Amino acid sequence: MAPLLLVLWASLVSMELTGGMMVNEVPAQNLSCFECFKVLQASKCHPIECRPNEKVCVSNEVLLYTSTKRRTQISKRCATACPNSNNVIEWSLGNTQARITRRCCSGDRCNRAPGSWEGFWSLPGRLLLPMGLGLFCTLL
């Protein structure tokens, strides 16, 4: 039983290191990003394939809020280069607060809104099974 678990663990680790897929010759694909313009919800953005010269994904979020109201406008697109660095600009005018968040990234669909499963715990979640099997084999 222990040798079988060891083989299973080794195959899972090798799959993790290769990105979970077999290594084959695959033709190069263009970058894909989410695209939308001044929508109120990130769920209204849809994935598109960028042109060959577009190498980054850009997202802008404009947030206006008061003590009783909140309005967000989201825009996302492909771009040839980052228009500016990632930044957050905040200001206030009377009782209205405003924030513009600009982000630029270079991975496929990297400009999506983070879901509840993403962020800090996403990498440990992907490694949990191989690490758990490794610990199990060690205890045998």
Swiss-Prot record:
Its main location: membrane. A lipid is attached at S116 (GPI-anchor amidated serine). Residues 117-140 form a propeptide. InterPro entries: LY6_UPA_recep-like, LY6H/LY6L_nAChR_modulators, Snake_toxin-like_sf. Residues 1-20 form the signal peptide. Disulfide bonds join C33-C50, C105-C110. GO terms for cellular component: plasma membrane; side of membrane. SUPFAM superfamilies: Snake toxin-like. It is found in: Cell membrane. Keywords: Cell membrane, Disulfide bond, Glycoprotein, GPI-anchor, Lipoprotein, Membrane, Signal. It comes from the Eukaryota. Residues 31-124 form the UPAR/Ly6 domain. It is a lipid-anchor; GPI-anchor. It holds the Pfam family UPAR_LY6. This is Lymphocyte antigen 6L. It comes from Mus musculus (Mouse).
